Design a protein with these regions (language model features):
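Structural preference for solvent-exposed beta-strand-turn elements
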Residues: 1-245
Length: 245
């Protein structure tokens, strides 16, 4: 595998991907890695912790197709430390090298077969203006709890209302509700609970796009903004009756 790309482009995507990679799963070291796949002039970066995943598609100067998995944090830190300009990434045996100008770094790799398949929701997507959705998330997500002992409060409720989609979050002390009229993402009476961590990462992605597509199906939610796709498991738990708070 070998490709060339602008440092800034690669650093931004790797930085976002590395935030999703697992830092605690010693049983599956590959979950701390970023999967780098080159096909022609397209680069696919993927990170996942099995619950939350993110993928980026970048245009690069592809020189040799291939797949490699290496530490997401290490790759991100190295590329970010390099000077502006083109960066070359290539595999040699069981290592991947990153070079730019006189600087060159070598990183060990994981077995690509140990990296799990990324599952996305499969249903017709609904498109929203990224700025509108980002504003709604900014108002609501901050009210969710960060206490994992109160799992139901760590998510954001998305519920179908007659006028569109309603977003709700609460930590039992604060309550935030935002309606998105005309956003018919869910069927009548349907509701899902999305982890606030996933929506915090989504907010970062929304800043760089004009539109966002949402797909809710089964036990997953998938969001696409530009060349980035974020997918998360839904919280299989009953959200509190916020109308009584």
């Amino acid at each position: 595998m070998k490709f060339r790309v602008e440092r800034e482009v690669l650093a931004e995507a790797l930085g976002a991907a590395a935030r999703v990679a697992s830092t605690r799963n010693n049983a599956m070291p590959a979950l701390s890695g970023v999967r780098i796949e080159v096909t022609g002039d397209k680069l696919l970066l993927s990170c996942t912790d099995n619950d939350l995943s993110v993928q980026f598609v970048l245009n690069v100067g592809g020189q040799e197709d291939g797949v490699v998995v290496a530490s997401a944090k290490l790759m991100s830190d190295i590329v970010r430390s390099m000077s502006e300009g083109k960066v070359t990434v290539e595999t040699t045996g069981e290592t991947v090298s990153i070079s730019s100008g006189r600087a060159q770094f070598t990183v060990p790799t994981f077995a690509a077969t140990d990296f799990p398949n990324i599952v996305q929701a499969s249903a017709p997507p609904v498109t929203l203006a990224a700025s509108v959705f980002a504003d709604a998330l900014r108002q609501v997500v901050r009210a969710a709890s960060s206490d994992m002992q109160r799992l139901a409060l760590t998510g954001v409720l998305m519920a179908a209302e007659p006028e569109g989609l309603r977003l709700v979050a609460t930590d039992s002390y604060r309550l935030a509700v935002r309606d998105l009229p005309g956003s018919n993402i869910l069927g009548h009476g349907e509701k899902v609970v999305i982890p606030s961590r996933a929506l915090n990462e989504l907010q970062r992605l929304l800043a760089s796009g004009e539109e966002a597509s949402l797909c809710l199906a089964g036990d997953r939610a998938t969001f696409t903004v530009g060349q980035a796709t974020l997918s998360t498991s839904l919280l299989q738990i009953e959200f509190p009756n916020y109308r009584q708070l």
